[in-house]
A protein has these predicted regions:
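Helix-to-beta-strand junctions that scaffold the AdoMet/dcAdoMet cofactor pocket
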Residues: 21, 94-95, 110-112
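A structural motif corresponding to the C-terminal end of an alpha-helix
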Residues: 157-163
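Glycine/Thr-rich phosphate-binding loops of Rossmann-like dinucleotide-binding domains
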Residues: 36, 75, 95, 126-127
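Conserved N-terminal segment of class I S-adenosyl-L-methionine
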Residues: 1-80, 84-86, 100-103, 142-148, ...
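Short, glycine-/aromatic-enriched active-site segment of Class I SAM-dependent methyltransferases
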Residues: 123-144
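Short catalytic micro-motifs in class I SAM-dependent methyltransferases
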Residues: 89-93
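A short glycine-rich, Lys/Arg-flanked "PGG" loop and its adjoining helix->strand segment in the class I
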Residues: 100-112
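Conserved beta-strand signature within the Rossmann-like core of class I S-adenosyl-L-methionine
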Residues: 113-120
Length: 187
């Protein structure tokens, strides 16, 4: 990762941090190398990161485990329930056909009252990232996986009765969005 990649990643983590409390059991989808856990430093036991591009030699660290694989099918059966599910710059990598299984997996693994924290860039970011990649200022991790995601889809994917939107805000000059959902008690 370049300095700019890390800067943008840290910005997303800072936006998520207020919604993650000390001791929360966290599931980080698209965890990369576990940076969210390292930045938080206070996640509860049983916290888990999952990412299909983790190197096969990736090792779990004290306080959290890392699993190479796809969500939800590769989450260990013993995992969860979680207080928080984080998807920081991840949702746009899911094809539309996977939104249903994604939402169902999140509903199954998130405790009632638990929080799901999502950051998703606006479609304009893809053009900006293309330029930054050409200038070698960012690596543009998995840009080929962006599927033309529209931000307005987000509340519909994680809809009632299983989820309740409790916060939506834009940041990074409107180029990124934060969504926070609460898992309802409805099944």
């Amino acid at each position: 990762m370049t300095f700019v990649d890390r800067f943008l990643q840290d910005w997303r983590v800072r936006k998520a941090r207020p919604f993650i409390h000390a001791g929360d059991r966290v599931l980080d989808l698209g965890s990369a190398d576990g940076v969210l856990f390292e930045r938080l430093g206070n996640c509860g036991p049983g916290s888990l990161g999952i990412d299909p591009i983790l190197p096969a030699t990736t090792r779990s660290r004290q306080g959290f485990a890392l699993v190479r694989g796809y969500f939800p099918q590769d989450v260990p059966a013993s995992a969860g329930p979680f207080d928080v599910i984080a998807m920081l710059a991840v949702l746009e990598h899911f094809p539309a056909a996977q939104y249903g299984p994604l939402a169902e997996g999140c509903a199954r693994l998130l405790k009632p009252g638990g929080r799901m924290i999502i950051t998703v860039p606006s479609p304009a970011v893809d053009m900006i990232l293309d330029v930054l990649v050409k200038l070698r200022l960012v690596h543009g991790m998995s840009l080929e996986e962006h599927h033309g995601y529209e931000i307005s889809q987000t509340p519909d994917i994680f809809a009632a009765p299983k989820f309740e939107l409790i916060e939506h805000a834009s940041f990074q000059l409107g180029l990124n969005n934060l969504f926070v959902f609460r898992r309802t008690k409805a099944s």
